[in-house]
Amino acid sequence: MILGQKEKIMNSWIFRVVVLASAVLFISSVQAETNVDKARDALAKKSDDADSTRQLEEVFQAAEKNYSLLRSGGKSLNYSLDYSYISDSRIDIDIVNNVVRNLDINPSATHSFTNSFSFDYGVLNNLTLNARLPLSTRYDTQQSLSVTDWGDASFGLRWQPFAYVPGKATVTVSSTLSTKTGVSPYEIDNRLRLSTGSGTYSVSTGLSVSKVLDPIVLFGSLSSSYSFEQNGLNQVRGGRVLKTVQQGQSFSFSSGFSYSLSYDTSLSISTQIGYSTETTLFFSNGTSASSPDSVSGSMNFSLGIRVDPKTIMNVSFGFGLTEDASDLNMGVSYPIDIGAFTW
């Protein structure tokens, strides 16, 4: 009897131990599966965050081309239509022996429409070449003048010295050569014809920085432009013959932010400030005339919209903050699919 009771007690304890051990093992397995699920969810969230950040950057870069590059071998063709309105007054004077002669004030209200095709090619993953060809139409409502002609073609490159790292600031260095293929303002009669170009060759360099702080992209850029001296001119201005032009050097700074309305739509707000040194005109009679240094400022807004998985359209609007800036700017750009073409 005593042995039977001991066996029953022993079996009872063994049963309890087995049940307790099974419960512990079951709970441990459930916790392990839960931890694995949490780890998978965490990894999935990180992957989704990287994808959404990249989408935001793509929409932003479509609006701000200075901050974007193509992969090696990549090609893109972009069409843009820009409108600007400038209203000012031009004063032509001739000063002889401290006496002002031929004083002439010419009011001007110019509407400009520019159709541009820009082609980009990725030489390396961090180096992109680009070319831009504009066709400009201008109207002066005060003088009843109009012109449609090519503008100044330009060629440039964009280079990222550091590899792209999600979440880190992106640095882009750019350089552009602008030609004088447009109608020069120094080779026409300003009273009878309008210009579509700058009249000189110029070289510009710039540095751009952007950083994604979802849902905001902060960006800023600093650039400088130098225009080469233009000789061999023969333009009559204020009773004198213009022979040489030395345009001043210019500097520009812009900064702003792009806010993500969604991962397919972003609104960019930026301001730009420019400073240009004096421009000197040399005439055939040995005299010269210089314009004062100028400061220009503008406020710009742009909306980038992803209309399909591979196409982002950009609409922009801006206005001048100083007298030397354009009164009004508007534009729209749209990429053209050239995937079927190979070179």
Segments from the language model and where they lie:
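Short loop/turn motifs that connect adjacent beta-strands in outer-membrane beta-barrel proteins
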Residues: 34, 65-74, 109, 126, ...
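Detector for outer-membrane/organellar transmembrane beta-barrel domains
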Residues: 72-88, 192-283
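Residues on the lipid-exposed face of transmembrane beta-strands in outer-membrane beta-barrel proteins
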Residues: 77-81, 117-123, 131, 155-159, ...
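Transmembrane beta-barrel strands of outer-membrane/channel proteins
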Residues: 79-85, 131-135, 173-181, 220-226, ...
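Outer membrane beta-barrel transmembrane domains
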Residues: 90-105, 240-343
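Residues that define the transmembrane beta-barrel architecture of outer-membrane proteins
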Residues: 111-115, 146-153, 169, 197-203, ...
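Outer-membrane pore/translocation modules
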Residues: 137-138, 144-242, 290-291
